[in-house]
Amino acid sequence: MIILNTQGIVLKAIRYKESDIILTLFTRKLGKVSAIAKGAKKNKSSLLSSSQLFSYSNFTLKKQGNMYKVTQSEIIKSFYNISYDIEAFSYATYITKLVENSILENQTNNRLFILLAQTLYLYTQDNTDNRFITAAFELKFLDYIGFKPIVNKCINCECKILQNSVFNIYEGGILCSKCSKLFDNNIKLDLTTISLMEYVLRNDILTCSKAKVSKYITHELEDILDKYLKVYVDNINFKSLHVLQSVKNNKGVDNDE
């Protein structure tokens, strides 16, 4: 019988039978696992709060067949107020779906775990620019799953003169003005956007959250990452992307610097 303690974040919570919940957890020690929280739907259950979507908790898990059973849990951060803000909820749902659909069972990724926990925390803060933070999450997520775009030098000749450079999704990064003539499907990006991408990749997301980014640059970053994700992430959830895009459209975008 395997029993272990690990920190975990609830990526999905599905009601099972009358009072149980089947959880998809992203954990530090086990990666993504399925676990059943018996009786968690009961009002007096000690597992109720830690079985809610986005909850970040210490879990005691016991191996049972193909899944685990939650025998004990203690909340670290509930992130409960995300559910009361439609915008924050939409962004949080999107990034948890992105993680859930992009990592394998029992595959650990502690950098991604910390990134997810910190991003959920930022969604609970009143002064967070959710659009920029979500784009920053996407960029760092791509790095942590092995698809980091190269933005600090030309991917072809490694020259670091990026004036008049372009971005090529299929080549995986920046092409200098000379090398851009050798490739198709280039996308022109503002040099500020390229510099911002380098900044995000170099710093943790809590540091990135302090940056003041214009709506125009945020929109350009969102657009290029949307295209990049669709090429490199096989199981991207298009339904959650559609919901997220509706939220963005309702917010509107202007070209103010």
From Swiss-Prot:
Pfam families noted in UniProt? RecO_C, RecO_N
Q: Which GO terms describe its biological process?
A: DNA recombination; double-strand break repair
Keywords (alphabetical) are: DNA damage, DNA recombination, DNA repair
One CC-aspect GO term: bacterial nucleoid
**InterPro entries hit by this protein:** ARFGAP/RecO, DNA_rep/recomb_RecO_N, NA-bd_OB-fold, RecO, RecO_C
Domain of life per record: Bacteria
The cross-references to HAMAP family, in alphabetical order and at most eight, read:
RecO
Role this protein plays = Involved in DNA repair and RecF pathway recombination.
The UniProt entry's sequence similarity note says:
Belongs to the RecO family.
What the entry lists under NCBIfam families is as follows: reco (TIGR00613)
Instruction: List the protein's name.
Output: DNA repair protein RecO
